Amino acid sequence: MKKTHITEQKFADLGLEPQVLDGLNAKGFINCTPIQAKALPVLLAGQDIAGQAQTGTGKTLAFLAATFNHLLTTPAPEGRKITQPRAIIMAPTRELAIQIYNDAESLIASTGLKAALAYGGERYEKQQKVIEAGVDILIGTTGRIIDFYKQGQIDFKAIQVVVLDEADRMFDLGFIKDIRFVFRRMPAPAERLNMLFSATLSYRVQELAFEHMQEPEHVVVEPDQKTGHLITEELFYPSNDHKMALLQTLIEEEWPDRAIIFANTKHKCELVWGHLAADKHRVGLLTGDVPQKKRERILEEFTKGEVDILVATDVAARGLHIPQVTHVFNFDLPNEAEDYVHRIGRTGRAGESGNSISFACEEYAINLPAIEEYIEHSIPQSDYDTSALLEDLPAPIRLQRRPPQNRRNGSNNGQRQSGNRKHSRPRPPRSPQA
């Protein structure tokens, strides 16, 4: 982290348990970010919070430190059974759940507390084996958590800490009934520490907090501007005929170290991926129907730099912590203004600068006024020279489906099997920076 992203508040001065501090120190976390500096004193005093902070502000570490600290300082309920976790952390997507677990690993090692994951897209047996051995902290998505509950693998009667991350996204994805199902099977709000985090504390999010929390304190950390002052924004108005050529031309000009391209539909993502893969870029595809193991592999390759470009739907826009993303391309302007902020928030994180390039095309330019109203500024517009666009580009690679007979009995849930091939397009030599 750079100094611009942290405060003078040190974790060591907050009164955290030594084992928790050891876990933080192991990852090099010494000073707090603003959300950590505001939230942790409240949580360590035993007060519930409803926190407003965007992804990339350090909120995950705030609720993890508070969760582990509370479990270390609070006796387990008398007569607690092996099927009863003491803390539950709910996330809207499996990628976010996995990321939270990964962020918790140093605290798991330093405290000796046991944690497990529960999310869809992976076979029950592997997750069930870990859960059956007994866990202190269960991290996952609501659907799979409820499945384990209904099978009698877990119950919520010994819950002492609850975390609801990306609460606004939970509403967007229609998970609110699942959330209430879980909450209503726990001890009363006064008997547990409750944390809710959301990019926006809308009326519906605050209503949820009022219903299932004990007089939560509102902790708000808002950036100077919604899109982050370290992100350079740029807007083009391409025709539909020029859109793909403009994208490939800009990639050739910018040659980003690590870029995410967002499109609004799975079909459009596959089309963009096909063009870039045919042009020998090292590109990965992340959409909702990519099998979980493949998703994890793609994200790992992208994080390690083995893949330079990730083409994604908004499934990747929230919660994923991928450091050093240099460019975000909005191939399609999102239909929801808030998603623009979440998308470009993949870059310009932790004090780093970033670039956002958006296309206001014939189909999605209608979304621009709402986006600019929401971010409270106009996106700087750039023109392009049609004669300078790349020509003679190869035909896109088409993703192929398995023959229908090979997809029976849920063998691959109808997922596309090709794609995400690793390409080795040589990078051009970088010109000296002016």
Curated annotation (Swiss-Prot):
<dbReference type="Pfam" id="PF00271">
    <property type="entry name" value="Helicase_C"/>
</dbReference>
<dbReference type="GO" id="GO:0005524">
    <property type="term" value="F:ATP binding"/>
</dbReference>
<dbReference type="GO" id="GO:0006401">
    <property type="term" value="P:RNA catabolic process"/>
</dbReference>
<feature type="domain" description="Helicase ATP-binding">
    <location>
        <begin position="40"/>
        <end position="219"/>
    </location>
</feature>
<keyword id="KW-0067">ATP-binding</keyword>
<feature type="short sequence motif" description="DEAD box">
    <location>
        <begin position="165"/>
        <end position="168"/>
    </location>
</feature>
<comment type="subunit">
    <text>Component of the RNA degradosome, which is a multiprotein complex involved in RNA processing and mRNA degradation.</text>
</comment>
<dbReference type="InterPro" id="IPR023554">
    <property type="entry name" value="RNA_helicase_ATP-dep_RhlB"/>
</dbReference>
<comment type="similarity">
    <text>Belongs to the DEAD box helicase family. RhlB subfamily.</text>
</comment>
<keyword id="KW-0694">RNA-binding</keyword>
<protein>
    <recommendedName>
        <fullName>ATP-dependent RNA helicase RhlB</fullName>
        <ecNumber>3.6.4.13</ecNumber>
    </recommendedName>
</protein>
<feature type="short sequence motif" description="Q motif">
    <location>
        <begin position="9"/>
        <end position="37"/>
    </location>
</feature>
<dbReference type="GO" id="GO:0003724">
    <property type="term" value="F:RNA helicase activity"/>
</dbReference>
<dbReference type="GO" id="GO:0016887">
    <property type="term" value="F:ATP hydrolysis activity"/>
</dbReference>
<dbReference type="GO" id="GO:0003723">
    <property type="term" value="F:RNA binding"/>
</dbReference>
<dbReference type="GO" id="GO:0005829">
    <property type="term" value="C:cytosol"/>
</dbReference>
<feature type="domain" description="Helicase C-terminal">
    <location>
        <begin position="245"/>
        <end position="390"/>
    </location>
</feature>
<comment type="function">
    <text>DEAD-box RNA helicase involved in RNA degradation. Has RNA-dependent ATPase activity and unwinds double-stranded RNA.</text>
</comment>
<dbReference type="InterPro" id="IPR027417">
    <property type="entry name" value="P-loop_NTPase"/>
</dbReference>
<dbReference type="InterPro" id="IPR014001">
    <property type="entry name" value="Helicase_ATP-bd"/>
</dbReference>
<feature type="region of interest" description="Disordered">
    <location>
        <begin position="394"/>
        <end position="434"/>
    </location>
</feature>
<dbReference type="InterPro" id="IPR050079">
    <property type="entry name" value="DEAD_box_RNA_helicase"/>
</dbReference>
<dbReference type="InterPro" id="IPR011545">
    <property type="entry name" value="DEAD/DEAH_box_helicase_dom"/>
</dbReference>
<feature type="compositionally biased region" description="Basic residues">
    <location>
        <begin position="419"/>
        <end position="428"/>
    </location>
</feature>
<feature type="binding site">
    <location>
        <begin position="53"/>
        <end position="60"/>
    </location>
    <ligand>
        <name>ATP</name>
    </ligand>
</feature>
<dbReference type="InterPro" id="IPR001650">
    <property type="entry name" value="Helicase_C-like"/>
</dbReference>
<keyword id="KW-0347">Helicase</keyword>
<feature type="compositionally biased region" description="Low complexity">
    <location>
        <begin position="406"/>
        <end position="418"/>
    </location>
</feature>
<dbReference type="InterPro" id="IPR014014">
    <property type="entry name" value="RNA_helicase_DEAD_Q_motif"/>
</dbReference>
<keyword id="KW-0378">Hydrolase</keyword>
<dbReference type="InterPro" id="IPR000629">
    <property type="entry name" value="RNA-helicase_DEAD-box_CS"/>
</dbReference>
<keyword id="KW-0963">Cytoplasm</keyword>
<dbReference type="Pfam" id="PF00270">
    <property type="entry name" value="DEAD"/>
</dbReference>
<keyword id="KW-0547">Nucleotide-binding</keyword>
